[in-house]
Amino acid sequence: MARSRCVHRVVHQAACIGVIGLSTSALTTCDFTGIFVAIQSEVPIKTPSIPGAIYGLVKAGSKLYATNGQLWKKNVAEEGKDWERESCFDSVIGDSRITSLAADNGENGVLVACILGKGAYKWSQGSADQTSGNPSALSGTEKALSVVGTGTSCVYLNHTDDKVGETSSSESGGMTASGETNEFCLHAGNGFLVTTKKVCVGSDGSPVAKSDGEEPVPPILAATDDGSGHVYILTKDKVYCKKVNQSEGKIQDCPQSAAAAPEPTGAHSVAHKVADAHSIAFFKNGSDEFLLIGGRQGYGEIKLERGSGSNGNGAQCVHLKEENVHDQTGWHEKGSTPKGSAEQYRSTIGRWAVSGIYVIKKSTSGGRGKRSTSTDCERPDLYVAVGDTNDTYTGLWRFDSAAQKWNRE
């Protein structure tokens, strides 16, 4: 994928408006009483500062941004504060809504929002977190349904038309068709792209499917990566691990060095055991790494193991093992929900459908005085979007590392 400022467009029909927007009203019908009521009385559920369902959350510069159709913001360093409305896109939204968010070069504070029926718009917070002018439209994106960030200066867009193509965000111009129809972009990074149909790799601005090893069985539901070139692909029944090989321009099963022990059979995929899985995230707490998989009731967790061999690009090979798969979190002290917090998790978000999982890396400086050790600072902030018809639970939740509890945001 080129590092030039660009926007790639991947086709999708109007009936498929985003995985995070998935309706979850039919996912859970369980009735819990007794012990759950007692636990909730010990940890009162907060009144949410963002009402309703959540369709996206990203970090851009020093701020977190979330959308429930409108835009909300929160300073990363100011823990315990409520979210506030951000009006930067209001002049464009009108009677429409934001469907998704992406951070274009996230550390620089550039935010991209997809506004249904209007297109994708970019806005920068500018110096000292001040507004840097009005939002600017990205050329040729009027039919965009959602936007997916890459962590660089490029974003992918899903469109209502029947073409796959690209257009530059810094230049005006048309679209060049270059791929299949009826695809939906799920996740992307520097040099790779995951759609509902396949995994693609490329650095020329037009990634193509070129894969070795075990192939994920479509439809692909979601994907994430660990920042070291490993991509984790979620399907109805399994999770697959693939390695981006930039030098050869392909996606492959993680190879072992000649000196390493042979990899276990089936190390590149594993059954995840999560019912109605539809979201996935990578979570690292110190040296412990996990995949988090949102589903019908709460989210599951898979602990990752890295082999001793190098994959040739500086990162150890990742193994997926059945004994490390859990259909619920709360089983491991270094997990996303520590073992001691499992009961409180089960009485709250563990009862309901999790439609989105957002892991936000922390900085060890600036506004982290509450954290007593550098080890604590290694634990990222964890947010989940609960989607259900029960207003007590629907919306954004966060795990409070200090209180060791889940609660509303």
Swiss-Prot record:
Coiled coil: none annotated. It is found in: Cell membrane. It comes from the Bacteria. GO terms for cellular component: plasma membrane. A lipid is attached at residue 30 (S-diacylglycerol cysteine). Residues 1-29 form the signal peptide. It is a lipid-anchor. Its main location: membrane. Keywords: Cell membrane, Lipoprotein, Membrane, Palmitate, Signal. A lipid is attached at residue 30 (N-palmitoyl cysteine). Belongs to the TP013X lipoprotein family. This is Uncharacterized lipoprotein TP_0133. It comes from Treponema pallidum (strain Nichols). The lineage of its organism: Bacteria, Pseudomonadati, Spirochaetota, Spirochaetia, Spirochaetales.
